[in-house]
Amino acid sequence: MISIITPAFNEAANLRSLHTRIVDAMTKLGVTWEWIVIDDHSRDETFAVLQQLSAGDPRVRGVRLARNSGSHVAIACGMHLAAGDAVIMMAGDLQDPPETIGAMLDRWSRGAQVVWAVRRSRPGDRSHASLAAIYYWIVRRVVGLRDMPATGADFFLADRRVVDAFRAFPERTTSVFNQLTWIGFRQEYVEYDKQPRAAGASGWTLARKIRLVIDSVTAFSNAPLRWCAYIGAGMLVVALALAVAGVALLPELGGGILLVLAVLFGVSGVQMLALATVGEYVWSALAEARRRPQYVIEVSTAETGDLAGTVNTVK
C-alpha cells in the first residue's frame, strides 16, 4: 500500500480537485493507497471538506490538529500515522502534480529508498524564488546537507524503513526535509514542473521562513558558534591594533572620542549578535528538553479508533 500525506492549512478550495487527480493517477498505476490529510487547524472549511471526502471514499482520512503548528509538524504527524510500504508527501495547493507519483514509484521499485521530486521550474515572483535559493544554499553550505537538491525539494517518497527511522527522531524544532536528507539511505531524484497555486493564499509567511532557517541551522550545525569565535578573535586583533595606533597617533589627531565610540558600538553589536546566536541554541535545547508533544490531534474522520486527543510520544 502507498500512503499519501498532505499538510493542509486553509485549503478547502483545493482538496476536492486534488482528490480527483489523486484518484485518477493512482487508478492508472493500479496500486492500493490511502490519503491522509492533516488539517493544521485551518480557519476555513478544510476539515468539513475532508469529512465529506472521507464519507464518500474510505481511502481518505482527515486529521485536524488542536492548534496551528506549522507544515513540518503536520508532515511529521502524517508520517507517524501512515501505514503504507512507502509514504509520499505532497502539498495541498495543487502545485505538486499527482501525475509525478508514477515516476517516483518507478524509482522506488528499482531500489531507491528516498525519492525527491526536484523542480525544473518554479512559478511565482522572483523574490520568493530568491529567498528559497538562499535557504537551500544555507542548508547545503552552512548546515552541511550537501545531498539536498540545489533547487530544493518538498515533494518526496520515503520507503517504510526510512519512515520507521524518521519516527525515532526526538527533535521537534527542525525541518522534515533536512532530517530525511541527513538520515541517509539510497536517495534519488525525479524532475517535475511545479504548478501555480490553484486557489487560496500560502500560509508560508516570511516570519515562518526565517524561523525555518534558524531551526535548520541550530539543529544540524555549530557553524554560527564558530563564526562568533572567529569574529571575536578578529576583533581582539583589531582592538590591539587600535590600541597601538591610539598610543602612537591620537595625541596628534583630533576626533579621538569618535573613534572610541565607533569601536564601542561595534564591539557591543558583535557581542549582542553572539549572545543572540548562543541564545538560539540554548532555546532550541530547552525546547527539546521539555519533551512537550509535537502535536495534539483534535479530531479525526476515522470511522474506527478515534484519534481525538492523541499526542505523539518520544521513546
Region roles according to the model:
Residues 26, 112, 142, 146, ...:
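A general structural signal marking secondary-structure boundaries and capping sites
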Residues 175-315:
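Hydrophobic helical membrane-anchoring modules
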Residues 1-125, 314:
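Structured catalytic core of nucleotide-sugar glycosyltransferases
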Residues 63-81, 95-174, 179, 195-214:
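Acceptor/aglycone-binding surface of glycosyltransferases and processive sugar-polymer synthases
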Residues 7, 65-67, 156, 229, ...:
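Short conserved micro-motifs on helix faces and helix-strand junctions that flank
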Residues 56, 84-85, 110-111, 169, ...:
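Structured helix-beta-strand junction loops
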